[in-house]
């Protein structure tokens, strides 16, 4: 089974982000891996306003090291990157792994 990676934010409602990506990957018969860049929370008491917590690039790098240690990735999808440092970190591994 091919391995596919999503580098994106997490949406606790499952309607977007990593959670939605993993469901889509499963529908297409590929094994989904994920690396989080941010966490999105929503407050139902304020009309579902969003709050985004960005994760540091050092944490993203640790996740990417874990994913790529398991062998090659057939495809990659990016979503909300959170900040410029995460974009640069993801780019480093995309180039390094030749995805």
Go through each PLM region and give its residues.
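Residue-level detector of alpha-helical secondary structure
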Residues: 20-24, 38, 59, 63-66
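N-terminal glycine-rich anion-binding loops that anchor highly charged ligand groups
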Residues: 28-42
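Short, glycine-rich nucleotide/cofactor-binding loops
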Residues: 8-14, 82
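Extreme N-terminal starter segment of soluble prokaryotic enzymes
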Residues: 1-5
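Ribokinase/PfkB-type carbohydrate-kinase core domain
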Residues: 43-99
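N-terminal basic/disordered segments at the start of proteins
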Residues: 14-31
């Amino acid at each position: 089974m091919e391995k596919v990676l999503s580098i994106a934010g997490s949406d606790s409602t499952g309607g977007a982000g990593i959670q939605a990506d993993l469901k889509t990957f499963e529908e297409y018969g590929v094994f989904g891996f994920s690396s989080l860049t941010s966490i999105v929370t929503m407050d139902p008491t304020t009309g579902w306003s969003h709050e985004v917590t960005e994760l540091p690039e050092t944490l993203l790098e640790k996740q990417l090291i874990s994913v790529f240690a398991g062998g090659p990735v057939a495809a990659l999808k990016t979503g909300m990157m959170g900040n410029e440092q995460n974009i640069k970190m993801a780019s480093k591994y995309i180039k390094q792994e030749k995805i």
